[in-house]
Amino acid sequence: MNKIILAADIGGTTCKLGIFDENLNRLSKWSIDTDTSDTTGYLLLKNIYDSFIQHIDKSDNTFSDVLGIGIGVPGPVNFETGEVNGAVNLYWKGTVNVRDIFKQFVDCPVYVDNDANVAALGEKHKGAGNGADDVVAITLGTGLGGGIISNGEIVHGHNGSGAEIGHFRVDHDQRFKCNCGKSGCIETVASATGVVNLVNFYYPKLTFKSSILQLIKDNKVSAKAVFDAAKAGDQFCIFITERVANYIAYLCSIVSVTSNPKYIVLGGGMSTAGLILIENIKTEYHNLTFTPAQQNTEIVQAQLGNDAGITGAAGLIYTYIIEKDGVK
């Protein structure tokens, strides 16, 4: 019987689950509600295990065919131990060792990583990264996160804080406070939240009218509204879009001279803004970046969407067991 990989992408509302074959092709996917009633994490992880059992029982496989289980979690993860510290979206208290809890149910390998890292791994293997060994994924959503793949593996650093790219200091005036407690992080000026921050900061200085004036006054402005107005020629929104693009280009430049990726993959809701954002990023990136570091590097849009996390969770087993150890 062919071997399979089990994958879980744990979110604050739902958990996406899936079964993949040993070539990282998805065989099935489904979701369950995220149970946040248990602050130890045990109940949620048991629910995930039970759901895996139910779906395997309906298939042609048995649990003995499972090569391993990959799990993506929204919070800081110690990759070596499987510990998650501060998963506030799941209401877990203190440190939860996801690997140890799951190993109470199974005897196969269990790999755990941060959700942004696994999304990057998903794009590397099955998305816009085209299987390249050096890929950086940047997620532009309510916040800004991402992951760095170098020489085929996720960059974790000595304590799991490697590639926390949302906290690069780019706003040296430190105008906006970040959720991390510090000010000036790129997340405060180049995420969907950051777009609104910039609108509210610059609007009082406006010398011309804007089509989003009423949205600003009603405190209902959004990144989408800004980008849509920019496409329609609103000069204020074009200015904001260019500022955001410049910050993202600066981030891309930093990662280029640091890890020299083949692909810089832009994902998340803001990446769908279209050419008005992406082309501005590319232009400024080429102006900023050390020439050898940008040669043959492509800035591309993510392809997997909401499936990046579950694909990357399975990718943990594919990368660290099948590819690295040659196990099939």
Swiss-Prot record:
Keyword Kinase: yes
Record EC number: 2.7.1.2
Catalytic activity: D-glucose + ATP = D-glucose 6-phosphate + ADP + H(+)
Family annotation (PROSITE patterns): ROK (PS01125)
GO MF term set: ATP binding; glucokinase activity
The UniProt record lists the keyword ATP-binding: yes
GO cellular component entries: cytoplasm
Alphabetic keyword roster: ATP-binding, Cytoplasm, Glycolysis, Kinase, Nucleotide-binding, Transferase
Subcellular location: Cytoplasm
Biological processes annotated in GO: glycolytic process
Domain of life of the source: Bacteria
PANTHER family documented for this protein: BIFUNCTIONAL UDP-N-ACETYLGLUCOSAMINE 2-EPIMERASE_N-ACETYLMANNOSAMINE KINASE (PTHR18964:SF149), ROK (REPRESSOR, ORF, KINASE) FAMILY (PTHR18964)
NCBIfam families to which the protein is assigned, alphabetical: ROK_glcA_fam
Full protein name: Glucokinase
